């Protein structure tokens, strides 16, 4: 297995757990503290993976993963310590811009380099995550009543943009990077 793709699969799988758990929490199906602990654990684990990607020369991928990790550190503090979520809401606005840029980057890269055309999927995933973060901004920072929509989008994206592609990467059924060596 190519180490880079395995690391991306690992990160996608872990982030999928967080998306699913956060969605269930927003629907009132789980306790905030237990999902806060999950957010903290995943933030630490994907930060380590991001550092490994950085040492392999994939700093852009490491930065994308680090943006997720920062969200999860903040969510852990909100869920476990009861902090206000407005700051997270404003971070989500910034994150929306970051994920839109990555969506463009991955889609353009996959179009320009046919050997790695599969990275266009990461562009689609980033666009989906940007939508989620934009709705979270409206909900958390501006107080719009979109919590249920955000919860269901978390759950849907947990499967479609994270669990399924993560498992495909981990089981070597998908090779979007064309075998980039690590």
Go through each PLM region and give its residues.
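Cytoplasm-facing juxtamembrane segments at the starts of transmembrane helices
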Residues: 28-41, 81-97, 117-125, 138-160
């Amino acid at each position: 297995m190519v180490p880079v793709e395995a690391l991306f699969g690992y990160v996608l799988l872990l982030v999928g757990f967080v998306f699913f758990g956060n969605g269930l929490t927003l629907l009132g199906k789980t306790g905030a503290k237990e999902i806060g602990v999950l957010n903290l654990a995943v933030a630490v684990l994907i930060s380590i993976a991001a550092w490994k990607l950085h040492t392999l020369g994939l700093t852009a991928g490491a930065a994308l993963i680090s943006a997720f990790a920062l969200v999860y550190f903040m969510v852990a503090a909100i869920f476990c310590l009861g902090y206000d979520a407005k700051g997270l809401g404003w971070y989500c606005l910034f994150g929306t811009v970051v994920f839109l840029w990555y969506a463009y980057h991955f889609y353009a890269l996959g179009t320009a380099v046919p050997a790695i055309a599969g990275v266009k999927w990461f562009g689609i995933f980033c666009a989906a995550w940007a939508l989620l973060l934009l709705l979270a901004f409206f909900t958390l920072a501006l107080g719009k009543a979109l919590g249920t929509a955000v919860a269901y989008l978390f759950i849907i994206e947990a499967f479609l943009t994270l669990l399924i592609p993560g498992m495909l990467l981990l089981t070597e059924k998908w090779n979007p990077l064309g075998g980039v060596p690590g």
